[in-house]
UniProtKB/Swiss-Prot annotation:
This is Chorismate synthase. One of its GO terms (molecular function) is FMN binding. It comes from Clostridium tetani (strain Massachusetts / E88). The keyword Transmembrane does not apply. FMN binds at R131, T132, S133, Q251, G252, S294, K309, P310, I311, P312, S313, R335. The gene is aroC. NCBIfam families: aroC, PRK05382.1. This reaction introduces a second double bond into the aromatic ring system.
Length: 386
């Protein structure tokens, strides 16, 4: 039986269709939505170094079709849409009148082309391309941007930075140091060290010249999550499992690490985050567990590294098979970015924001925003009195 959740959403739309759309159910009423903030998150997703030609066409703006009265949530399902500027150029291709010899039958290794062709049997890889495309992340960013605003009102923030491009690494810094984070957010590649940024740019430029793409790592931190979110009572209620499930759904993500989880050099006495008690609160001098123990938030920042593979659409020829005649051939190129790591950092912030708000509402069920604020404020003020 599927687990009931207070907050849920579905999205729909094709990469070159008329619009990307989402229905969000469970957002509390009487919350004033900052639409400019959502549009700014969409802009942050687009203005990244390493992007392809599509981002010169699209000027993403969110439109609310239901669930708001003015800018105030009503408690009804919220329908959001981002209309695709590129859609008119693809009307004939997506019309269903494509001739047999115009159908795409050469799958790109690493993409959903081959699996989609056989799973759905439409005879045209274009159908899987349209839905597996990372264009879908535009509407997921908008959904998360709404959740981010609600979280900020209850003292929770999600931030990110690019930690690596290929085998080049940036410094790990406190994302909640406002001066440092402003520098990161103004960086072309959302990194802190200026010399590292130059190296990142050079690496991406070399890949572009060689017809290649490149992956990397994103570091995420969530501040303000109270102790007790998630549960170890059942396997499917653990907070790290839920976050992993959501994060792994992002196109290109192949691994996730919480805290220092992949540092195999540490022994138990060093890895375990010691427990201290100061000024009426429990504190940890380290955060190797990444803010989650036994599937439950422990009050520290939730910290994750997310590993993103190179984009599968490359100009460099590699082997594949033409599904029309089953003969070996080389890959075809579909317009794409050189690196998705920088935009992924923005998308991941918003994916995490949705998941954290979902678990907040599961723990503090609230139909109305001020009810939620009261519930969580009371909990924060009394939890350590137990």
């Amino acid at each position: 039986m599927e687990r009931y959740t207070m907050l849920r959403f579905l999205d729909a739309g094709e990469s070159h269709g008329k619009a990307m759309m989402s229905i969000i159910d469970g957002i509390p009423s009487n919350f004033k939505v900052d639409i400019d903030f959502i549009n700014n998150e969409l802009k942050r997703r687009q203005k990244c170094y390493g992007r392809g030609g599509r981002m010169k066409i699209e000027k993403d703006k969110i439109q609310f079709l239901s669930g708001l009265r003015g800018t105030m949530t009503t408690g009804n399902p919220i329908t959001m849409a981002i209309y695709n500027n590129d859609s008119p150029n693809w009307e004939k291709i997506l019309s269903g009148e494509v001739k047999k010899d115009e159908k795409i039958t050469i799958p790109r290794p690493g993409h959903g082309d081959l699996v989609g062709y056989f799973k759905y049997g439409t005879g045209d890889i274009r159908d899987s391309i349209e839905r597996t495309s990372a264009r879908e992340t535009s509407i997921r960013t908008a959904v998360g941007a709404l959740c981010k605003q609600i979280l900020k009102g209850i003292g929770i923030e999600v931030r990110s930075k690019v930690y690596s491009i290929g085998n080049l690494f940036d410094e790990k810094v406190d994302l909640f140091d406002q001066c440092k984070y402003k520098k990161i957010d103004n960086s072309l590649l959302r990194c802190y060290n200026e010399e590292v940024e130059k190296s990142f740019v050079k690496k991406i430029d070399i890949c572009r010249e060689q017809g290649e793409t490149i992956g990397g790592t994103v570091f995420l931190s969530v501040r303000g999550v109270p102790i007790g979110l998630g549960s170890y009572s059942q396997w499917d209620r653990k907070l790290d499992a839920l976050l992993s499930y959501a994060i792994m759904s992002l196109q290109g993500v192949k691994a996730i690490e919480f805290g220092n989880g992949m540092n195999l050099n540490l022994r138990g006495s060093t890895f375990n985050d010691e427990i201290l008690y100061e000024k009426g609160k429990f504190k940890r001098p380290t955060n190797n567990c990444g803010g989650i123990e036994s599937g439950v938030s422990n009050g520290e920042n939730i910290e994750m590294k997310v590993y993103i593979k190179p984009i599968p659409s490359i100009k460099k020829n590699i082997r594949t098979v033409n599904l029309r005649n089953r003969k070996e051939t080389t890959t075809r190129y579909e317009r794409s970015d050189v690196s998705a790591v920088v935009p992924a950092s923005i998308v991941l912030e918003n994916i995490v924001a949705f998941e954290i708000l979902k678990e907040i509402l599961n723990k503090f069920p609230s139909d109305e925003y001020y009810e939620l604020k009261r519930n969580i404020s009371h909990y924060r003020g009394t939890i350590y009195l137990r």
